[in-house]
From Swiss-Prot:
The gene is ybeY. One of its GO terms (biological process) is rRNA processing. Single strand-specific metallo-endoribonuclease involved in late-stage 70S ribosome quality control and in maturation of the 3' terminus of the 16S rRNA. SUPFAM superfamilies: Metalloproteases ('zincins'), catalytic domain (SSF55486). GO terms for molecular function: metalloendopeptidase activity; RNA endonuclease activity; zinc ion binding. Gene3D superfamilies: Metalloproteases ('zincins'), catalytic domain. GO terms for cellular component: cytoplasm. Belongs to the endoribonuclease YbeY family. It is found in: Cytoplasm. Binds 1 zinc ion. This is Endoribonuclease YbeY.
Amino acid sequence: MNLYIDLQIASENTVGLPTAAQFQHWVDKALAMEAKTADYPETEITIRIVDEAESHELNLTYRGKDKPTNVLSFPFEVPEGIQLPLLGDLIICRQVVEKEAVEQEKPLEAHWAHLAIHGTLHLLGYDHLTDEEAEEMESLETEIMQSLGFDDPYIAEKTIEE
């Protein structure tokens, strides 16, 4: 196994949260498909499940946005000359994930998987600031999600655009 996940639960309500094994499976698939090999380098990711207050504070501090958000990605910046397998940290807000799943009429597990994958791709350097970047990232997210047996996470948006 090339992946170690440090799962931190900082949410008061833990009912219905994905297990460490589920996060491991989703992130492992994202890393393998992005690298196009199951033999990607050894990697460590911290996933912290938080409530709205912590998400709000972090989103305001690091992105200047005065509200909680679904997922924040903090890539690890390795100091020069040091070899560490740390990819970075994902902060996922339980309440936002649950609200979005209901609003978007998605199965909760699928939305958790999607945000873990989305955040992992951000840690790998993907972004969606331009249409071209968004198309590349969303295409890879969809491919990964479908390989895991989930629907295209952007199907509702694509249907609206058509």
